[in-house]
Amino acid sequence: MENLSSRLDLLQEQLMNLYEQDSKLIEDQIKQWNLIRQEQVLFHFARKNGVMRIGLQAVPSLASSQEKAKTAIEMVLHLESLKDSPYGTEDWSLQDTSRELFLAPPAGTFKKSGSTLEVTYDNNPDNQTRHTIWNHVYYQNGDDVWRKVSSGVDAVGVYYLEHDGYKNYYVLFAEEASKYSTTGQYAVNYRGKRFTNVMSSTSSPRAAGAPAVHSDYPTLSESDTAQQSTSIDYTELPGQGETSQVRQRQQKTPVRRRPYGRRRSRSPRGGGRREGESTPSRTPGSVPSARDVGSIHTTPQKGHSSRLRRLLQEAWDPPVVCVKGGANQLKCLRYRLKASTQVDFDSISTTWHWTDRKNTERIGSARMLVKFIDEAQREKFLERVALPRSVSVFLGQFNGS
């Protein structure tokens, strides 16, 4: 007990010294998160051995200390990677590297030098929301390379422009209006500029699977005056689908916004078939279509079938898990999975994106595949792995080694 108390005192004293120093070195911020990790590991060990108090300090629950230790590990990984980038020599304060700021919109990025943007709904000055425009946003692309960009605002929302030309929106004004407005009208005020939306047309219901059609959006430019108001004629903004994507004809700039939050199939086999859909017909020796791959959840029968027939049977069933989220979140998850001795899987991919059928534009968030030997191994994986809240999970079948 005395060893635990002295060890805890030493860790907390080192933390207090770092807080008082108010260092701007990224090495000190990494040290701070490593000390937090050690502190939570000590709490976890104490609680697991029945210790409820260390000195005057109550020992948190096992779940709490475990979650905080994992958070500290994640922050260390991000900061060590950032340290090795060209931006590692910049000033980094405790606030710049705090967990709260890291998760603030745009989530999963480091940010500096924010300014406030106000959105007024229904022409009511008492009905407003505020959002932050960041002068510097540090994010990792799909190749795990850190980039430094700035936030921007246009008639659609607040975004940061990635180096490959994508507008990554972290605030969509139409979504905010659906929460806080009764008429759907909003006005945006930023640095003396103001523009508002005017609903002049309505969108007609579209068939399932048909692409949404969006009208052009003017961008708030530096030439706007303090009293100038720009009207926006729009039809529909996405917000409920898997990917919120708006295409601007005027700027020819691809737009995307990453959704956050875990989503997992709850069906026993994870097939994800909607109610009313029929099981695909299957004749002996038939070749499964792209849609049918993974749709039959049975193990191919053993026997004296030809190699071709067995390969065709196996094409229906190989199990995978597709994880979707920010590239840096997936990188951290992949690191944890490969380092873990408690989780079994066959192989894991690097991060990747879907692309548009007509060009090379990336669509939506990054993805990563985890392949398994059989469905039993996948079920154990889903039971044992605590996935971050910032990723979504989909189950499927995939043929290949």
Swiss-Prot record:
There is a cross-link at K324 (Glycyl lysine isopeptide (Lys-Gly) (interchain with G-Cter in SUMO)). Phosphorylated. It is found in: Host nucleus. Residues 254-267 have a biased composition (Basic residues). Keywords: Activator, DNA replication, DNA-binding, Early protein, Host nucleus, Isopeptide bond, Phosphoprotein, Repressor, Transcription, Transcription regulation, Ubl conjugation. One of its GO terms (biological process) is regulation of DNA replication. Residues 1-202 are annotated as: Transactivation domain. Pfam families: PPV_E2_C, PPV_E2_N. Residues 218-233, 241-253 have a biased composition (Polar residues). GO terms for molecular function: DNA binding; DNA-binding transcription factor activity; nucleotide binding. Residues 317-401 are annotated as: DNA-binding domain. InterPro entries: E2/EBNA1_C_sf (IPR035975), Nucleotide-bd_a/b_plait_sf (IPR012677), Papillomavirus_E2_C (IPR000427), PPV_E2_N (IPR001866), Reg_prot_E2 (IPR033668), Regulatory_protein_E2_N (IPR036050), Regulatory_protein_E2_N_1 (IPR042503), Regulatory_protein_E2_N_2 (IPR042504). It comes from the Viruses. One of its GO terms (cellular component) is host cell nucleus. Residues 199-308 are annotated as: Disordered. HAMAP family: PPV_E2 (MF_04001). Binds DNA as homodimer. Interacts with protein E1; this interaction greatly increases E1 DNA-binding activity. Interacts with protein L1; this interaction enhances E2-dependent replication and transcription activation. Interacts with protein L2; this interaction inhibits E2 transcriptional activity but not DNA replication function E2. Interacts with protein E7; this interaction inhibits E7 oncogenic activity. Interacts with host TAF1; this interaction modulates E2-dependent transcriptional regulation. Interacts with host BRD4; this interaction mediates E2 transcriptional activation function. Plays a role in the initiation of viral DNA replication. A dimer of E2 interacts with a dimer of E1 in order to improve specificity of E1 DNA binding activity. Once the complex recognizes and binds DNA at specific sites, the E2 dimer is removed from DNA. E2 also regulates viral transcription through binding to the E2RE response element (5'-ACCNNNNNNGGT-3') present in multiple copies in the regulatory regions of the viral genome. Activates or represses transcription depending on E2RE's position with regards to proximal promoter elements including the TATA-box. Belongs to the papillomaviridae E2 protein family. This is Regulatory protein E2. The gene is E2.
